[in-house]
């Protein structure tokens, strides 16, 4: 695997994805983030799960060689955060090792083969929701939620309706 990406974009999706990884598990692979580089689509995809929730995030990348590894969910975002503000290279030079380079900085992290990761089955794209407008939707409706002291729990909620026309 050999990938060239922007540090800020990679840090954003690595931090987001790491939130789904459990702190403890019986399988070492579940504690990590599955990192997959696809040269055909020029995409880098990160996936993490705790068997209840799954976070999968993708970004455009310059992929010279496809491949996948599982990397520690605690170490991967921390290593990226400490890199200088420039392009980042991710490379599996040797089996069981991911090298992260940026400028003069270099990290070598232990990695598992991507085949070891228990990849969750995700629903078809028709059954998923884009979350791009969810933040603004919440921001525009939360003013109507009752303050503390109102005895009725439904008055402290926001109703979201998902239908064929989208999210309302």
Regions found by a protein language model. Give the residues of each.
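Structural preference for solvent-exposed beta-strand-turn elements
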Residues: 1-168
């Amino acid at each position: 695997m050999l990938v060239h990406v922007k540090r800020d974009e990679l840090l954003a999706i690595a931090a987001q994805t790491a939130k789904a990884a459990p702190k403890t598990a019986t399988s070492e692979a579940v504690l990590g983030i599955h990192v997959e580089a696809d040269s055909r689509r020029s995409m880098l995809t990160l996936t993490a799960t705790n068997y209840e929730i799954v976070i999968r995030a993708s970004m455009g990348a310059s992929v010279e060689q496809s491949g996948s590894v599982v990397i520690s969910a605690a170490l991967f975002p921390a290593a990226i955060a400490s890199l200088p503000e420039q392009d980042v290279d991710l490379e599996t030079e040797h089996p069981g090792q991911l090298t992260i380079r940026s400028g003069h900085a270099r990290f070598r992290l232990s990695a598992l083969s991507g085949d070891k990761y228990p990849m969750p089955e995700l629903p078809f794209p028709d059954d998923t929701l884009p979350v791009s407008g969810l933040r603004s939707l919440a921001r525009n409706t939360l003013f109507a939620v009752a303050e503390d002291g109102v005895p009725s729990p439904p008055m402290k909620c926001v109703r979201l309706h998902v239908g064929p026309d989208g999210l309302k």
